[in-house]
């Protein structure tokens, strides 16, 4: 069975591996049932989900109707105002068929504007405290993607006494001196306060680039061989007092659980360096945060636009109730130095792609199409 340890200050004995239910975002009911049954085989007792993860909350809700006492359930919200966050929580409670959620997390709290809104008057933090006081949630946390997240989480902990944090952690990412320093400072603070540290991206190989997406891992191309997954998961589990959230693909889940089940000691840095070379591993956030994308010609422009839009989505640019028209998107990309010029057809096509994949919503107004995150 996968080992367990106390989940921060919550008093809960959680498996060191947490099921990341993005894997269920496109799953059928039969696939979801098989996946959740697999968790029980390995003794996994902790699920991380979110209302923006496609079918995930509904699939888990059907399962929790019979197995609620077997799992610690965490969900998230990307809403930044008190009212919208509470509405989002109500939706999650209904979908999950539960009276309360164990851990509610502010998702993607990694940009300054969103952070100020959440922490300010009428912000989502008020909803979090209110929901906890009413018994709708038990514990509160923050999550994020990208190179900036350790610093932002530290800032959040300095403002409010959150119970958990969630952020990327893998061997290659920790070779970035700036990220490693900020990450270690955050972990040190979390240990002092007994804040649970959850990590993601343990089996990330490299950005997808122009390669076909053969797995349901949105941000990155994953490692897929059992040996490579073993080494990566064992390296991540080598961080004491931390928890690893599984990758977002149900086909990879058995391999990740098998690796965690056999964990004894951390993979050596020498072995990890060899694997980086063997699999041509690359930092997955090298275009995010402070990167400035440039127009390098017609063959690369579309990819750059797509990556730039992903950054805006991560930063909360499209958060409801903001409905962004094409002209606003172009201006945002240009003003941040992400693009040197706007090419409307390419950007419009990239937006349409995000809509098809369910990451953005769109509707037509008198001034044209507008886009937002529901």
Residue ranges and their predicted role:
Residues 300-323, 352-356:
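Positively charged, polyanion-binding regions of nucleic-acid-associated proteins
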Residues 7, 19, 47, 60, ...:
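Conserved, mostly hydrophobic/aromatic
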Residues 320-334:
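Short acidic, hydrophobic short linear motifs in intrinsically disordered regions
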Residues 355-365:
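A short, conserved structural fragment
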Residues 56-66, 85-97, 115-124, 148-160:
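Distinct, well-ordered alpha-helical segments
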Residues 365-374:
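Short, cationic-aromatic polyanion-contact patches
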Residues 1-71, 127:
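N-terminal binding-site loop/beta-alpha segment at the start of enzyme catalytic domains
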Residues 4, 109-293:
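Beta/alpha (TIM)-barrel catalytic core signal, keyed to glycine-rich beta->alpha loops juxtaposed to Asp/Glu
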